[in-house]
Amino acid sequence: MTKILIVEDEQNLARFIELELEHENYDVDIEYDGKPGLEKALSNTYDLILLDLMLPNINGLEICRQIRQNQTTPIIIITAKSDTYDKVAGLDYGADDYIVKPFDIEELLARIRAMLRRQPQKNLIDIKGIIIDKDAFKVTVDGQPLDLTKTEYDLLFLLVENRNHVLQREQIITDVWGYDTEVETNVVDVYIRYLRNKLKPFGKDKCIETVRGVGYVVRQ
């Protein structure tokens, strides 16, 4: 499901947009303050962000700038500022579109659809803030890169791709190390420990559950 973040301090407007987007089958998060809005944008994977300019604590331009340093997520600015200077500033800071309040909700929905059509499909798996980019062979946790060896990456990918399914140690060895390997099953336990140690600073080590006597599972 397409995920959209709304960062807007006018709660009634934010809630109205949320209801309209949910009616269109979008998955929606809302933040009413700039600081948590920025944190949520950087620690999650969104398909599009709707961003007000005049926000508490961190203004929309600064949020836009910081997002652009880390992501290419499409940003549509929604604001009462209608001057050409403000529009140019918003676009120069990295926004992809700019719509002035008050606006017709149908126009906003059309702009969202148009923006999403222009975006390439992301080949990502996202579970509990652990994001695996299958094209780039990279993993981020809450927006921060996770440094993994090839074997660690292959093991984490296997667990996440088979989320909610308990994988036996023998199956893990076959899928990660290959059919003709002489690796013992206890090596799986060693690499699970490596992964948990790397996930622990993010509070994600418990995402990999042990099923005693069987193997391991990552649950959605």
Curated annotation (Swiss-Prot):
Record-level GO BP terms: regulation of DNA-templated transcription
SMART domains registered for this protein in UniProt: REC, Trans_reg_C
Domain named Response regulatory: residues: 3-116
GO terms assigned for molecular function: phosphorelay response regulator activity; transcription cis-regulatory region binding
A single Gene Ontology CC term: cytosol
4-aspartylphosphate PTM sites in chain numbering: D52
Subcellular location: Cytoplasm
Keyword hit for Repeat: no
Entries under Pfam families matching the protein: Response_reg, Trans_reg_C
Magnesium recorded as keyword: no
Post-translational modifications reported in the UniProt record: Phosphorylated by ArlS.
Main location: cytoplasm
Function: Member of the two-component regulatory system ArlS/ArlR.
Protein name, entry field: Response regulator ArlR
Source organism (scientific name): Staphylococcus saprophyticus subsp. saprophyticus (strain ATCC 15305 / DSM 20229 / NCIMB 8711 / NCTC 7292 / S-41)
Lineage: Bacteria, Bacillati, Bacillota, Bacilli, Bacillales
Primary gene name: arlR
